[in-house]
Curated annotation (Swiss-Prot):
Part of the 50S ribosomal subunit. It comes from Pseudoalteromonas atlantica (strain T6c / ATCC BAA-1087). SUPFAM superfamilies: Ribosomal protein L22. Disulfide bonds: none annotated. This is Large ribosomal subunit protein uL22. Belongs to the universal ribosomal protein uL22 family. GO terms for molecular function: rRNA binding; structural constituent of ribosome. The keyword S-adenosyl-L-methionine does not apply. InterPro entries: Ribosomal_uL22, Ribosomal_uL22_bac/chlpt-type, Ribosomal_uL22_bac/org-type, Ribosomal_uL22_CS, Ribosomal_uL22_sf. GO terms for cellular component: cytosolic large ribosomal subunit. Transmembrane segments: none annotated.
Length: 110
């Protein structure tokens, strides 16, 4: 059985979050949580929260045993981009892109 959790509009770029997501794909959930706890990246904290939510969903909704769960799928899609203006010298302006992403974690027992 599978349990899913998502975090939509996470304030990190999808490219940066995918670096962390690729590290935990296919791991046992305890090993994945340990790896995320010691990762220095901001997106590791976001993915850790989503993983904990997916584990709780599996336990509560599906009645799954936590000791048998693995991270079956992790994917990070691009969310909406906020566009901002940064004033520059001589009346010019640069665009700033504040990117967001949608993080999805699926856990399953073997």
């Amino acid at each position: 059985m599978e349990a899913l959790a998502t975090h939509r509009h996470a304030r990190t770029s999808a490219q940066k979050a995918r670096l962390v997501a690729d590290q935990i794909r296919g791991l046992h959930v305890e090993k994945a949580l340990e790896l995320l706890a010691y990762s220095p990246k901001k997106s590791a904290d976001l993915i850790k929260k989503v993983l904990e939510s997916a584990i709780a969903n599996a336990e509560h909704n599906e009645g799954a045993d936590i000791d048998e769960l693995t991270v079956s799928k992790v994917f990070v899609d691009e969310g909406p981009t906020m566009k901002r203006i940064k004033p520059r010298a001589k009346g010019r302006a640069d665009r700033i892109f504040k990117r967001s992403s949608h993080i999805t974690v699926v856990v399953a027992d073997n």
